[in-house]
C-alpha cells in the first residue's frame, strides 16, 4: 500500500507509500500550457502511463494474456491444459513475481500444445465479474484447468510448496500426468517411464526417426522436461526409463544418471556426449540432430502486440495535502470490488466486516454524503439477526438501490495523491495506507466518536480492526502475511491513541525500507523514510552524528497532515458527476478541456471499476433482511425527507421512480373506494325506485 503522505512512494502491497520529491512536483495549472505542451508532458510520463499498461503484454511476452472475453473460451473443451495466474496489477507481490512468470512462460514455450501459461488481470474493470465467477479472493491465485473440460469449472488450485520457477514447472508436469488417458492433451506424449524390456525392443527395431531414452532416478523430472521440450519437433521420439536395474544399465554402458541414450534411424545406438547432464544440454543436442525440425502444430492465434496509444493528463497535486478523492476511490474499490469477491460472509469474516464498517462510519472524515452512507451501512449491519449474509445485499445498499437522498459514494477510481507513473503502481494500496493513517488520527483527535461502539476504551481499536481486515480481505495475501508478522511483534505494546498513530507510522516506514528497490517501487515516487525533511524539518534531528526522529514533532505533523482540516475536495466526484449525466467535479472541467477528445476515454483511473448495473441480479434474501434494510433506510432518511425521483426502477419494461409508484398505489386505492361507493349508492337507489305489483283478489 502506499503512504498516506504523498511524499513517500509506498509500494503496492502493505508496504508501499507515496513520496514526491520537490523537484518533481508538477507545474501549477496557472501556467496554462498550450495544448501541445500538455500532451507532450503527458506522453513523457512514460509508455506505461496509459490505462492499457499491464504486467503482461500480448505479443511481447510468452504469457497468454486472457480477459473476460477469452478466458472461458480458452479453458473450456481445450485440447491443451492451462495454468492461469489471476492477479491484480496493484498487488506488490504480483508485480515482483511478474519476471518469474514471464521466465516460466518462456522456459516452457515448447510445451504450449500440451499446457499453456496464462495470466488475467482482475484489476481491470472488464475482468472483475469473471474473477468473481472464478471465486478469486486473493492475488496472485494460480489455477490449473484440465484439457477437454466441457462444463464450467473454477479450476484446481496450485499446491506447490513454493512459487519458484522450478517448483511450478514440476507441478505442471504432475498436473499433466494426472490427466486420465481419455482427457490427456493429444499433443502430450506419455510421461511414464518404460520398462527395460521395452528398451530392448527399441534397440532391435529400425525406424525413420530417432529414439532418445533418458535414464534417470525416480525423483527426477529431467526426462519428462526433455520429453515436453521436444513436442514441437518431428523425426524424434523421446521417452524415459528409471535406473532401478543396475545390471541392465551396465550392459548399455550407462554409468551415471541422468544420461541420454540415443537410437539412430540406421539402428546404431549409444550414449550422447554433453558437457553437463542438464535439461538444457540434452534438449539442445536432440533439437540439433540432422533431420530433426519443428513441425507445424495447430495453436490458437495469440493476440497481436498491443499498441499503447493512450495519453493520460497528469493530475497536479500538493504533496502536503490529503485528497478526498483518494480516500473515496479506495472506499469504492474496497466495498465494491475487494469485499465483493466474497459471495457471502459469515462467522469471523462477517464480524470483521461489521467492526471495520463501524470504525469507518464513526471516524471517516470525508464528505457528508459518504459519511451518511457509511452510517447507514453500519446501522443496518449492526441490526442484522442473521449469521450469514450474501454480499450482494451489502452492494445493494452501497449502490443506493433504494434511491435515498443525501447518500453517495463515487463509482469511479480516480487517483490524485496516489497516482503513479504507470497504472499498475501505487493506486489502491496507497489509498488504503492513507485511510488507515487517517483513522488512527481521527481516533486520537476525536475520542468521543467511538462511544457506544464497544471500542471507546480500546487504544488499539483502529489498529486491530485494520489488522483483521488486512488479514481476512486484503487481496495481496503475501502483503497481509507480512503485516500480520509486524502486528504480532509489537501491536500489543500500544497503550494510547497517540501511540497507535506512531506505531502505524513506524511500521509503514519499515515496509518502505524493505521494499525500496523492489519492482513494485514507482521510480517517480521512490520509497523514502517519511515525512521527508522538506515536509517536516522539525521531525528530523541529529544525535551524536546519527540522523534520528523527533517523535514529538512527528506526532504533531501526522495529526496535522492526516487531520480533516487538511482534506481537499479537489477532483472529487459529486452526485451530479459527468459520468452520471450531471456536472463535472471541481478540477475536472479544465482537465477535460486539456485532454484531446479522441483519447479522453483512455484514462482508466477515471473509469468505473464496477458500475452498479454490472453487479448482477439481487439474490433472494430472507424477509428479515429486507425489513431490516428498509427500516434502516427510513430511519436514516428522516421523517420529512423524500426519496430521490431522479433514479428510476424498471417495472414492466417502463422506468418508474419511487414517487411514481407511490402515486400509482394511491390512485389505485382511491379508484377502488370510489367504485365501491358508487356501487352501493346505485344499489340503494334501485331498491327505492322498485315498483311493487299487487295481484287482484279473486
From Swiss-Prot:
FAD binds at residues 426, 433, 437, 478, 482, 505-512, 527, 530. Belongs to the quiescin-sulfhydryl oxidase (QSOX) family. Residues 586-607 have a biased composition (Basic and acidic residues). Keywords: Cell membrane, Disulfide bond, FAD, Flavoprotein, Glycoprotein, Membrane, Nucleus, Oxidoreductase, Phosphoprotein, Secreted, Signal, Transmembrane, Transmembrane helix. Disulfide bonds join 91-94, 122-131, 418-430, 476-479, 536-539. Catalyzes the oxidation of sulfhydryl groups in peptide and protein thiols to disulfides with the reduction of oxygen to hydrogen peroxide. May contribute to disulfide bond formation in a variety of secreted proteins. Also seems to play a role in regulating the sensitization of neuroblastoma cells for interferon-gamma-induced apoptosis. The active site is at 91 (nucleophile), 94 (nucleophile). This is Sulfhydryl oxidase 2. It is found in: Membrane; Secreted; Cell membrane; Nucleus membrane. It is a single-pass membrane protein. The chain crosses the membrane at residues 662-682. The keyword Transcription does not apply. Its EC number is 1.8.3.2. Residues 34-178 form the Thioredoxin domain. Its main location: membrane. Residues 572-581 have a biased composition (Polar residues). One of its GO terms (cellular component) is Golgi membrane. Its cofactor is FAD. It catalyses: 2 R'C(R)SH + O2 = R'C(R)S-S(R)CR' + H2O2. Residues 610-622 have a biased composition (Low complexity). Expressed in pancreas, brain, placenta, kidney, heart and fetal tissues. Weakly expressed in lung, liver and skeletal muscles. Pfam families: Evr1_Alr, FAD_SOX, QSOX_Trx1, Thioredoxin. The modification Phosphoserine is found at residue 579. GO terms for biological process: protein folding.
Amino acid at each position: 500500500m502506499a503512504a498516506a503522505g504523498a511524499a513517500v512512494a509506498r509500494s503496492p502491497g502493505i508496504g508501499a507509500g507515496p513520496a514526491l520529491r520537490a523537484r518533481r512536483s508538477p507545474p501549477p495549472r496557472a501556467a496554462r500550457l498550450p495544448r501541445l505542451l500538455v500532451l507532450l508532458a503527458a506522453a513523457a510520463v512514460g509508455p506505461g502511463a496509459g490505462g492499457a499498461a499491464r504486467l503482461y503484454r500480448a505479443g511481447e511476452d510468452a504469457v497468454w494474456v486472457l480477459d473476460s472475453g477469452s478466458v472461458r473460451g480458452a479453458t473450456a473443451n481445450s485440447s491443451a491444459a492451462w495454468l492461469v495466474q489471476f492477479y491484480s496489477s496493484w498487488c506488490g507481490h504480483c508485480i515482483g513475481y511478474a519476471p518469474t512468470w514471464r521466465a516460466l512462460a518462456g522456459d516452457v514455450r515448447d510445451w504450449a500444445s500440451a499446457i499453456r501459461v496464462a495470466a488475467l488481470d482482475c484489476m481491470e474493470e472488464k475482468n472483475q465479474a469473471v474473477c468473481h465467477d472464478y471465486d478469486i479472493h486473493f492475488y496472485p491465485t494460480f489455477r490449473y484447468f484440465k484439457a477437454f473440460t466441457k462444463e464450467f469449472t473454477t479450476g484446481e488450485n496450485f499446491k506447490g510448496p513454493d512459487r519458484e520457477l522450478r517448483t511450478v514447472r514440476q507441478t505442471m508436469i504432475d498436473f499433466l500426468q494426472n490427466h486420465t488417458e481419455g482427457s490427456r492433451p493429444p499433443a502430450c506424449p506419455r510421461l511414464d517411464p518404460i520398462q527395460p524390456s521395452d528398451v530392448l525392443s527399441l534397440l532391435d527395431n529400425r525406424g525413420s526417426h530417432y529414439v532418445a531414452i533418458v535414464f534417470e532416478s525416480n525423483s527426477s523430472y529431467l526426462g519428462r522436461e526433455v520429453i515436453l521440450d521436444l513436442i514441437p519437433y518431428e523425426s524424434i521420439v523421446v521417452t524415459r526409463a528409471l535406473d532401478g536395474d543396475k545390471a541392465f544399465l551396465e550392459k548399455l554402458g550407462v554409468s551415471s544418471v541422468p544420461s541420454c541414450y540415443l537410437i539412430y534411424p540406421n539402428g546404431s545406438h549409444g550414449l550422447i556426449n554433453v558437457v553437463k547432464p542438464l535439461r538444457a544440454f540434452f534438449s539442445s543436442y536432440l533439437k540439433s540432430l540432422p533431420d530433426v525440425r519443428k513441425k507445424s502444430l495447430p495453436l490458437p492465434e495469440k493476440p497481436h502486440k498491443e499498441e499503447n496509444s493512450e495519453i493520460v493528463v497528469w493530475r497536479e497535486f500538493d504533496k502536503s495535502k490529503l485528497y478526498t478523492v483518494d480516500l473515496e476511490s479506495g472506499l469504492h474499490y474496497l466495498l465494491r470490488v475487494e469485499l465483493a469477491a466474497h459471495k457471502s460472509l459469515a462467522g469471523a469474516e462477517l464480524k470483521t466486516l461489521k467492526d471495520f464498517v463501524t470504525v469507518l462510519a464513526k471516524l471517516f472524515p470525508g464528505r457528508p454524503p459518504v459519511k451518511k452512507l457509511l452510517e447507514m451501512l453500519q446501522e443496518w449491519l449492526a441490526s442484522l439477526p442473521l449469521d450469514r449474509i450474501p454480499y450482494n445485499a451489502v452492494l445493494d445498499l452501497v449502490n443506493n438501490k433504494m434511491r435515498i437522498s443525501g447518500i453517495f459514494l463515487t463509482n469511479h477510481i480516480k487517483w490524485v495523491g496516489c497516482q503513479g507513473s504507470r497504472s499498475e503502481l501505487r493506486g489502491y494500496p496507497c489509498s488504503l495506507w492513507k485511510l488507515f493513517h487517517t483513522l488512527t488520527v481521527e481516533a486520537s483527535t476525536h475520542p468521543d466518536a467511538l462511544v457506544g461502539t464497544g471500542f471507546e476504551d480500546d487504544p488499539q481499536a483502529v489498529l486491530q480492526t485494520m489488522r483483521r481486515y488486512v488479514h481476512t480481505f486484503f487481496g495481496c495475501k503475501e502483503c497481509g502475511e507480512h503485516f500480520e508478522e509486524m502486528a504480532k511483534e509489537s501491536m500489543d505494546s500500544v497503550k494510547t491513541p497517540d501511540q497507535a498513530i506512531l506505531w502505524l507510522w513506524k511500521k509503514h516506514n519499515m515496509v518502505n525500507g524493505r521494499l525500496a528497490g523492489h519492482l513494485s517501487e514507482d521510480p517517480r515516487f521512490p520509497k523514502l523514510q517519511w515525512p521527508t525533511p522538506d515536509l517536516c524539518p522539525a521531525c528530523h534531528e541529529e544525535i551524536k552524528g546519527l540522523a534520528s526522529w523527533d517523535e514529538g514533532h512527528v506526532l504533531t505533523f501526522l495529526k496535522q497532515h492526516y487531520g480533516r482540516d487538511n482534506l481537499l475536495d479537489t477532483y472529487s466526484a459529486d452526485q451530479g458527476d459527468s459520468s452520471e449525466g450531471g456536472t463535472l467535479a471541481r478540477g475536472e472541467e479544465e482537465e477535460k478541456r486539456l485532454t484531446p477528445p479522441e483519447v479522453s476515454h483512455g484514462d482508466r483511473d477515471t473509469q468505473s471499476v464496477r458500475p452498479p448495473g454490472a453487479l448482477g441480479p439481487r439474490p433472494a434474501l430472507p424477509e428479515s433482511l429486507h425489513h431490516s434494510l428498509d427500516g434502516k433506510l427510513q430511519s436514516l432518511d428522516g421523517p420529512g425527507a423524500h426519496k430521490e425521483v431522479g433514479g428510476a426502477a424498471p417495472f414492466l419494461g417502463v422506468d418508474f421512480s419511487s414517487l411514481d409508484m407511490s402515486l400509482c398505489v394511491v390512485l389505485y386505492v382511491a379508484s377502488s373506494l370510489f367504485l365501491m361507493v358508487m356501487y352501493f349508492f346505485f344499489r340503494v337507489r334501485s331498491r327505492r325506485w322498485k315498483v311493487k305489483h299487487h295481484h287482484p283478489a279473486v
